[in-house]
Every structure is written in structure tokens, then in C-alpha cells.
Amino acid sequence: MKLAIAMSLFFIANAFVNINICGSGIYLPYYMGVLGCIKKNYPISNYSITGISGGALCSLLYTQEKDLSNHDKLWDMTIGKNISVISLHTNIKKVREQIEYNLKLRYSGIKNKISENISIISTNVGNFYEIKSETISSFDNINDLIDFSLCSSYIPYISGSNFSKYYKDGNYIDGQVTYENIELSDVNTLYLHKGMWNRDFSNMNNLLLSKSESQKLFEYGWNDTNKKNIKIFK
């Protein structure tokens, strides 16, 4: 797996690359560090990107933002300057409301092109007896993309007051629920997950994330990716 990821980074400048970003949980800043490093140091012009759960927000930001190198800017423009800690128990609903409000405000009045190569995976729970994974690759506008990205990371009764999040006549929950991770050997595929560079996260609190801890995770993701690529390009 790690060799496949490393080789895909080696060919990144010229080859078509599939970027798959799985559920992140509290490790979303680590993913953003990886993506920020790639976007700055190994820009990809020809790619498809798929986001699942927290990876949906990562995918959205990757396609809409030119620069992902500043952690504090990313935190402030999504979560907000007024929030310094994210807690799964106390304020996750408010955090999600802030993300939706801030992103829709940021992109309002701007002709942001919805990338044709972005896909978001969520879990359709419209029929309780047939819960299924659903992929959407076409969006009406930026708000539509934001809405479905938030569906993909919706945890029943934790992310909001209801079991599911409503979207276009359907009800959805976290995309990771029904998505099966697949070991990928394609050298042109980047599969982002917290263990991709073999970093030890055993001391992390999975229910609480401060802005300073988020900064550390972002730097870990950036530096881990840089180290791997330094070895490759020598």
C-alpha cells in the first residue's frame, strides 16, 4: 500500500491520478496537511477526487481552493475564528452549522466552477431495509456540493437532531457506514487515510480537538508527505 502511494506521487506531474479520501474523524487536519503539501509541491492537473465522510470536505476544499498551505486560514474559513475546540459531545452540531454557513458565505457571489472530477459518497437510508452507498458526481452549484458533503459526514443524532440529513428527496448519513475500504495497488491512485504514512496516533483523543492540536496534525500530514517524496526524488 505505502509503495503504491509513493509511486503514484512520483508520476503525479504527468499522469492521471485518482485521489480517494476516506473517513477522517478527528484526523481531518492530517489529511489536509497531506493534500496541502501535494497541492503546493506536486500540483496535479489531471485527476479525479472522491471524498467519503470527513474526506468529502477535504475533496471540496481541494477543488475550490488554490492554496491549502495555511492551517489557521483553513480553520478560520471553515470552522470559524470564534471556535477553538471541537468536541464530539458538546459542540459538533454548532461546528457543522458554522462550516456550512462559512463555506456558503465564502463562495457566494463567486463563480466557483464545480469540478467535473469530484465525487462524494454518502449512505442513503431512505429505505431502512436497503441501506446503500450512493455516489454523486454532478452538482447544481457550490451550495449543492456543500450540502451533500455534509450529508457524507453526518453521524445520526450527533451531527444533528435527527437520524439523517435530508438532501433532494433523500435521507443520508455518514458515507463510511456502507463503504468498504479496498486495498489499492494502482500506482496512479492516492488513497488517503490516517495510516498511509505509518504514523502512530495512539495518544490522540478521538473525541476532542483543539485548534493547536489540529495545527500539529496538519504539520504531521505535510511533513510526512514531504519526507516520503524527498526519498523518492533523490
Question: Where are the regions a protein language model picked out?
Answer:
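Classical Sec-dependent N-terminal signal peptides that target proteins to the secretory pathway
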Residues: M1-A15
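Patatin-like phospholipase
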Residues: I12-T50, L60-K234
